[in-house]
Swiss-Prot record:
Lumenal side: 102-561
Gene Ontology MF term list: 3'-phosphoadenosine 5'-phosphosulfate binding; N-acetylgalactosamine 4-sulfate 6-O-sulfotransferase activity
Family from the record: Belongs to the sulfotransferase 1 family.
Gene: Chst15
Residues that bind 3'-phosphoadenylyl sulfate: K263, C264, G265, T266, T267, R392, S400
General function of this protein: It also transfers sulfate to a unique non-reducing terminal sequence, GalNAc(4SO4)-GlcA(2SO4)-GalNAc(6SO4), to yield a highly sulfated structure similar to the structure found in thrombomodulin chondroitin sulfate.
Protein's membrane topology: Single-pass type II membrane protein
Enzyme class: transferase
UniProt cross-references to Gene3D superfamilies, sorted A to Z: P-loop containing nucleotide triphosphate hydrolases
UniProt protein name: Carbohydrate sulfotransferase 15
Taxonomic source organism: Mus musculus (Mouse)
Length: 561
């Protein structure tokens, strides 16, 4: 029979500093409670990320035994303390060395690889009213992060030394057709001359009892869109053209696209612009069809599903097509050549930058760069499309993006650590591949704990300018939009050749409250650390400088925001 020596050690991940557990040891032959301590609760202390005395967590309890002398009891208790102390120290050091993770054991390097979340699958805009609050910064830094700055600066310098804005190789039309045979068979090469939006009539072979949206993937995979399509079903047959026993439906693509960027005010721009009577948007604000749904990506974390056919995308514009059809029918009787003024828009904030699906569907090129980009296909069908881009200081965009999409443990400290992790991952890619290859690298983008790549505006814009002219773009800054909404909206109206609004309509559009406001719990977290801001400004600096050169506007360098 052995005596109970209670040497209890336990690590707790929570923030409590002690916890009680029942002792189950003691001088017994079976699993009954220890007669010495009588199952009493023992106090266990937490070992956290601060400096710690490992032996302080050991509690040795020995009580008298008639067969042992005092000296023997003292030696055995001391020996147990020493053995358990060495065991705990070994386990802690092994955990630190093997994982390098910051798991409240020891303060680890900020450059570690952990479990990285996948990128979110839903993009959204940023509220202009949140812009000004980002300029305030706390007066002090986390001291440990300041000490880490020299090593982080080496990473940033390494990235900057490898930045080259090279010209991409453009695919020819036949290559595009081979990749999307069905899409090219559905969308014609010419559109109706009397519609500002690219529209055409196609034959509908169903009957008046046929459900045209029965197999639409947007309906099947999202309950919130079903009411919209229920309304479209009820009026569908009445909006067909009936000629010599045949039925024709009007199909349309967008006249303009709001292509980006996420957390840059696209939602607010969309909400104001749709108040104009000549503008009609898709049934869903962000279909993400060009970048995701046509590849079968519903949520990135769920992998690939069945691809959404182009017909499902075109269904989203049926409500606008119905109104255009009515206008065309009315005009044909009076003035056949009269142009229909209604224009269709689409506002997926992923269109400009997200090409993550290419590795799953296109043959890999020898240099790691995607052979096809989203804009190649849009240009193939709509070479005259108009493109609107809303941008903001990429440093503040990244923090807003982090606050919006992070689900738990959000803080300035957590953001700083994720930024440093992302920078190291990006540098590792740049050591072996080109800038473009890294920006469009799906594995890297899913590994980075913050979406560092979304703020590399110059890379994306230069690639879009390989197929579209600069005159087809309207590029806005969220900072300007937040300070003067009326001026921004007038620029948009002029760019889209929209008619003037009445005073009442304009007041409603410009004085409406900002959309997509920041959540109160995110506001309470405050701004990022000044040292984090400094790191990000140095990283994004070369890209902002190039963007300002391309646009011939120093405001896009964000040197004084």
């Amino acid at each position: 029979m052995r005596h109970c020596i209670n040497c209890c050690v336990q690590l707790f991940p929570e923030d409590t500093h002690k916890q009680q557990v029942a002792c189950q040891g003691g001088p017994h032959h079976s699993h009954q409670a220890c007669p010495t301590c009588k199952g009493e609760n023992k106090i266990l202390f937490r070992v956290d990320s601060k400096q710690m005395n490992l032996l302080a967590v050991l509690e040795v309890r020995t009580e008298g035994n008639e067969n042992w002398g005092g000296f023997l009891r003292f030696r055995k208790g001391k020996r147990c303390s020493l053995v358990f102390g060495l065991i705990i120290m070994t386990l802690v050091m092994a955990s630190y060395i093997l994982s390098g993770a910051h798991q409240e054991l020891l303060i680890s390097s900020p450059f570690h690889y952990g479990g990285f979340p996948s990128n979110p699958s839903v993009m959204d805009g940023e509220n202009p009213s949140d812009v000004k609050e980002h300029h305030y910064q706390p007066s002090v830094n986390n001291i440990s992060y300041v000490k880490d700055y020299p090593s982080i600066k080496l990473i940033i310098d390494s990235i900057a030394a490898r930045i080259e804005f090279t010209t991409r190789q453009l695919p020819d039309l036949q290559d595009l057709k081979r990749q999307e045979l069905h899409m090219f068979s559905v969308i014609p090469s010419k559109f109706l001359p009397t519609s500002k939006s690219p529209c055409w009539y196609e034959e509908f072979s169903g009957r008046n009892t046929t459900d045209p949206y029965l197999t639409n993937s947007y309906v099947l995979y999202s309950k919130r869109f079903r009411s919209t399509f229920d309304a479209l079903r009820k009026v569908f047959w009445g909006h067909l053209s009936h000629v010599q026993g045949k039925h024709f439906r009007l199909r349309c693509l967008p006249h303009f696209y709001i292509i980006g960027q996420p957390k840059c005010g696209t939602t607010d721009l969309y909400d104001r612009l749709r108040l104009h009577p000549e503008v009609k948007f898709s049934a869903i604000k962000e279909p993400h069809w060009w970048t995701r749904k046509r590849f079968g990506i519903v949520r990135l974390r769920d992998g690939l599903r069945d691809r959404y056919p182009v017909e499902d995308y075109l269904d989203l514009f049926d409500l606008a097509a119905h109104q255009i059809h009515q206008g065309l029918q009315a005009a044909s009787a009076e003035q056949p050549s009269k142009m229909n003024k209604i224009i269709i828009g689409e506002a997926s904030a992923s269109t400009m930058w997200d090409n993550n699906a290419w590795t799953f569907f296109y043959d890999n090129s020898t240099d790691g760069e995607p052979p096809f980009l989203t804009q190649d296909f849009i240009h193939a069908f709509q070479p005259e499309a108009k493109l609107i881009v809303m941008l903001r200081d990429p440093v503040e965009r990244l923090y807003s993006d982090y606050l919006y999409f992070a689900s738990s443990n959000k803080s300035a400290d957590d953001f700083h650590e994720k930024v440093t992790e992302a920078l190291q991952l990006f540098e590792n890619c740049m050591l072996d591949y080109s800038l473009r290859a890294c920006v469009y690298n799906n594995t890297l983008n899913n590994a980075m704990p913050v979406r560092l790549q979304v703020g590399l505006y110059a890379v994306y814009l230069l690639d879009w300018l390989t197929v579209f002219s600069k005159e087809q773009f309207l590029i806005l800054r969220l900072e300007d939009h937040a300070s003067n909404v009326k001026y921004t909206m007038h620029k948009v109206f002029q760019f889209l050749n929209l008619g003037p609004l009445s005073e009442k309509q304009e007041a409603l559009m410009t004085k409406s409250p900002a959309s997509n406001t920041r959540r109160p719990e995110d506001r309470s977290l405050g701004p990022m650390w000044p040292i984090t801001q400094k790191i990000l400004r140095e990283f994004y600096g070369p890209f902002n400088t190039r963007l300002a050169q391309v646009l011939d506007d120093e405001a896009f360098a964000w040197k004084t925001t």
